[in-house]
């Protein structure tokens, strides 16, 4: 038997909801009951694999409806900044690179700016990359061990900042 727990979302354990989910996971584990936790919200602020790992969940027990029908597995963010730089040829195309906090800014010659958000500054892994031109957000890519989602922003300039 497998018990399926249906939830909207998960965060950084900022409320009792996350702890209740973890307690449920531990309780089922102690008595040997297979379990899956289903999350139905579109979770893009942070990688769901990082959020569930923070609480100690086994990612094999996590089902996120937004990638369930793909071959992308739930995983913590381990996509390296070096891989991104190589794939997009950023070292050659960028006229200026600077790091501010957990963000690495690449100024490209055509006025496009890429902003990579570090999920772990020490390991140099990323979880998001934003594409900005003339202070307007155009696109954002989301990463775990691979790119798993992309958002496009096509509204008026004032809506994309």
Predicted regions and their residues:
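Repetitive, compositionally biased segments used for assembly/scaffolding
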Residues: 84-161
């Amino acid at each position: 038997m497998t018990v399926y727990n249906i939830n909207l979302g998960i965060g950084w354990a900022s409320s009792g909801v996350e702890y209740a989910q973890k307690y449920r996971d531990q309780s089922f584990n102690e008595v040997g009951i297979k379990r899956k936790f289903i999350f139905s919200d579109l979770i893009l602020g942070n990688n769901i694999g990082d959020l569930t790992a923070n609480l100690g969940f086994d990612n094999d027990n996590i089902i996120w409806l937004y990638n369930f029908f793909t071959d992308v597995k739930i995983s913590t963010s381990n996509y390296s900044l070096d891989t991104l730089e190589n794939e997009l040829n950023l070292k050659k195309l960028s006229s200026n690179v600077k790091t501010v906090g957990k963000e690495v800014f690449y100024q490209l010659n055509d006025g496009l700016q890429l902003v990579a958000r570090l999920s772990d500054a020490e390991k140099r892994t990323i979880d998001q990359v934003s594409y900005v031109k003339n202070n307007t957000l155009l696109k954002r890519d989301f990463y775990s061990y691979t790119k798993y989602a992309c958002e496009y922003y096509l509204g008026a300039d004032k809506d994309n900042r």
